[in-house]
């Protein structure tokens, strides 16, 4: 990358990074499937020379500098559990739980350095609710929540979101109409702040994160979905 400087406004600048090194990623995981439905996983991933654009307040002048720099380490390890469950014929749900330890280190972050670690928890619940069969109405409802996190010198506030979609199948299931809203309460993009060794910065990127979509599809003629070979599950004791 070139060392050019571009200006966002009278205070913010974007600096290029000559000599930026490619990152190297390593990862591993161990998974256990219980009763062919419950999934438990241990995971680890580490990126050496990880690069990411972050903000830094210059110490010699009034300027906010955005620059992509190589970090020494970006590491995550933790556990993940996926628990599906069903209530009658009207509710099909999946609960995903994740707990991880994040470590980020950079010894040459402008005139600073950082070596930070944090425990992070993530919960996600996906639900499919059968409202009625005649008419064929289905509600998809998903909720997500994440505890405070870090990103370089940033402290990331907790984040949560709710997504909802209503699907109507009609004309002998050849036609489908879906109305969907993502991030219903505009809470999915967290507030970020820097309070680190004299750096003081607030960043709110969450405005207008709610989205609405309408999707219509129609299957003509006698089209049938292509059948695929079933997966061999004998290794699960089936």
Summary of predicted features, one role per range:
Residues 1-48, 135-142, 155, 159:
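Structural signature of Gram-negative outer-membrane beta-barrels, strongest in the C-terminal barrel
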Residues 1-6, 10-14, 45, 50-59, ...:
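Outer-membrane beta-barrel translocator domains and adjoining extracellular loop/strand segments
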Residues 15, 21, 27, 39-96, ...:
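Outer membrane beta-barrel strand-and-loop segments of large Gram-negative receptors
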Residues 21-37, 42-44, 76-77, 84-86, ...:
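Outer-membrane beta-barrel transmembrane strands
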Residues 24, 34-36, 46, 85-91, ...:
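Outer-membrane beta-barrel strand-turn architecture
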Residues 26, 32, 38-46, 95-101, ...:
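Transmembrane beta-barrel strands of outer-membrane/channel proteins
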Residues 34-38, 77, 89-95, 135-139, ...:
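Outer-envelope beta-barrel architecture signal
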Residues 117-238:
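Conserved C-terminal beta-signal and adjacent last beta-strands/turns
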């Amino acid at each position: 990358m070139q060392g050019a400087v571009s200006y966002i406004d009278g205070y913010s600048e974007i600096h290029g990074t000559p000599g930026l090194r490619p990152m190297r990623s390593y990862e591993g995981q161990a998974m256990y499937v219980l009763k062919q439905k419950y999934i438990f996983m241990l995971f680890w991933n580490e990126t050496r020379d990880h690069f990411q654009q972050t903000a830094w307040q210059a110490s010699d002048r009034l300027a906010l500098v955005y620059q992509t720099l190589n970090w020494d380490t970006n590491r995550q390890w933790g556990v993940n559990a996926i628990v599906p469950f069903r209530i009658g014929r009207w509710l099909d749900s999946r609960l995903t739980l994740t707990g991880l330890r994040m470590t980020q280190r950079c010894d040459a972050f402008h005139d600073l350095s950082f070596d930070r670690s944090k425990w992070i928890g993530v919960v996600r619940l996906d639900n499919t609710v059968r409202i009625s069969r005649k008419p064929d109405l289905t509600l998809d409802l998903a909720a997500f929540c994440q505890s405070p996190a870090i990103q370089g010198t940033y402290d990331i506030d907790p984040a949560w979101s709710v997504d909802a979609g209503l699907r109507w199948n009609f004309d002998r299931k050849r036609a489908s109409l879906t109305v969907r809203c993502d991030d219903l309460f505009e809470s999915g993009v967290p507030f970020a702040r820097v309070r680190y060794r004299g750096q003081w910065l607030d960043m709110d990127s969450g405005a207008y994160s709610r989205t609405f979509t309408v999707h219509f599809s129609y299957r003509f003629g006698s089209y049938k979905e292509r059948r695929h070979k079933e997966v061999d599950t004998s290794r699960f004791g089936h």
